[in-house]
Amino acid sequence: MQVPSPSAREAASMYGTAVAVFLVLLVAVLQGLAPPESPLPYRIPLDPKGDLELSWDVSYTQKTIYFQLLVQELKAGVLFGMSDRGELENADLVVLWTDGDNAYFGDAWSDQRGQIHLDSQQDYQLLRAQRTPKGLCLLFKRPFGTCDPKDYFIEDGTVHLVYGVLEEPFGSLEAINTSGLQKGLQRVQLLKPKISIPALPEDRRTMDIQAHNVLIPSKTTYWCHLTKLPQDFPRHHIVMYEPIITKGNEALVHHIEIFQCTNQFQNITSFSGSCDSKEKPQELKVCRHVLAAWALGARAFYYPEEAGLAFGGSNSSRFLLLEIHYHNPTNIRGRYDNSGIRLHYTAKLRHFNAGIMELGLVYTPVMAIPPKESAFVLTGYCTAKCTQAALPPLGIRIFASQLHTHLTGTKVVTMLVRDGQEIEIVNRDDHYSPNFQEIRMLKKTVYVYPGDVLITSCTYNTEDKNEATVGGLGTQEEMCVNYIHYYPQTQLELCKSHIDPCFLQKYFHLVNRSNLGEYCTCPQASGTTCPQASGTTCPRASVPEQFASVPWNSFSRVVLKALYDFIPVTVHCNKSSAVRFPGKWDLQPLPEIISKLKEPTPRCPTSRDQSSSSLTVVNIGGGKV
């Protein structure tokens, strides 16, 4: 059947023909494999009001994702897709739109001006379209990789999903521009690991750590709530935890974490309020040990059946800090929340204690990112010397990981190196966002043995900064951390590094000399044993002040990058008491890498369905959206 194309220009560029396939309501397109019949297991709201809901499932054998988009109140169409950082410009899209007579479904893309173009290669395949009591439901599929330069390559890690709502008909697809649309983004891990779920013990009990009737603020807010375990609560193993989300708030609760406090304080002042509040007790700074973490799109987190995370007992603090990130960009008012996390635990301790270890960079200003950088990399090392000293002879097994940076982080990767050869990636996120952090189960267990090296690299974007961003605990400072979850637990709690401070002082002196002493970058008066260069007359400064004085030209940038890539490091091979394992940890050479892993290349589909070159017309309720 011949149908009118959106425009002659689009038809000519796409097909050379105006022939399209008419989709009868409730009838699936028969090309390719049949769509899954069971409900898709993963589900998130796309918009703050929950009018758009996405469900999906992953087929690793087909290397395909099945999507189901539920549109509760459809006006004139909807855009859905993916982009590198969550912009609707330069996005890979699928579009449902109407010209007033017919409804069309097609693979499209947007340019940097937000102009929509129909893709010459149709890789989103519509499988079913139907009206339901909840709204319009579209089921479609898309390969991970398409080898189409206009398409997004779906890979492990964070994916920035984007959407836009069309409120009026358009005569052609090219008449649509994203600038005037109601639009937004949602971050999610699409490629969920397919792992078996361990059986839970019959004696398990539950503990709900929840907020108490919080009036959700009208802006994005981190909410902190301090709670405590019962008096004389004995040692238990957490075997699973799951989110508790107040009904109706699913689109507003972005992520949740529970931190265990150290036993430094016998008592901590109760608190429930904004984490940025001046009334927040200073003692809460010791509540940094992650006990549980959930983010939008994640389901229950299970520990391996032979391991559990210990909490409670005489040597453990009773205090737990609940932190909830509320994301309310449309300023929805009058909504109260009691969300949190439900811990499932057992008194019958499992064979192994699970542990959490910090990899990456020490929180110190000697590690810094120059301003106006698009992709500056800093790297932290857990060296062979440390794993040799701290790990048991049979090694450890990593089963989950949580990556962490502050506001400028865009990519994080941890690599396992053995005998100078890169063995495998522990965890990697090429589209990392500090606004989406969750503990992720690994697709397969990673075994780490004494003498192995764990290298964690973070990439940062500081294009909007005018001064250097230094390392530290503050939100405006930076971090590079991978919290690995493993068993059996060892005494090693932190395995990180930073460059040798004295070499950094040589860098500052070199910058000062190259600029004829115009900029003051003299070392601080205390806290360092580095000798001060002769002939300096300016006042002494702290490392952040020194970085603030650097003139960021090509010379200072290139030299700092070379410094970080080649000079010796100080290794923090620390026990839980913050005491290092015995040994010499200063001026350690960087690990030598003699063999690198090959970068994965996207696999193109071996064959394409005939429908992939046809525009689909959707007949829904008389042919109109």
UniProtKB/Swiss-Prot annotation:
Keyword Nucleotide-binding included in the entry's annotation: no
SMART domains hit by this protein: DoH (SM00664)
DOMON domain: residues covered: 50-166
Listed GO CC annotations: chromaffin granule lumen; chromaffin granule membrane; extracellular space; secretory granule lumen; secretory granule membrane; transport vesicle membrane
SUPFAM superfamilies registered for this protein in UniProt: PHM/PNGase F
Cystines in this chain: 147-604, 224-275, 261-287, 382-495, 386-573, 458-480
GO molecular function, one term: copper ion binding
Cofactor, how bound (note): Binds 2 copper ions per subunit.
Subcellular location: Cytoplasmic vesicle, Secretory vesicle membrane; Cytoplasmic vesicle, Secretory vesicle, Chromaffin granule membrane
Parts of the chain that traverse the membrane: 10-30
Residue ranges that the UniProt entry lists as topological domain Cytoplasmic: 1-9
Quaternary structure note: Homotetramer; composed of two disulfide-linked dimers.
Protein name, as recorded: Dopamine beta-hydroxylase
Species annotation: Canis lupus familiaris
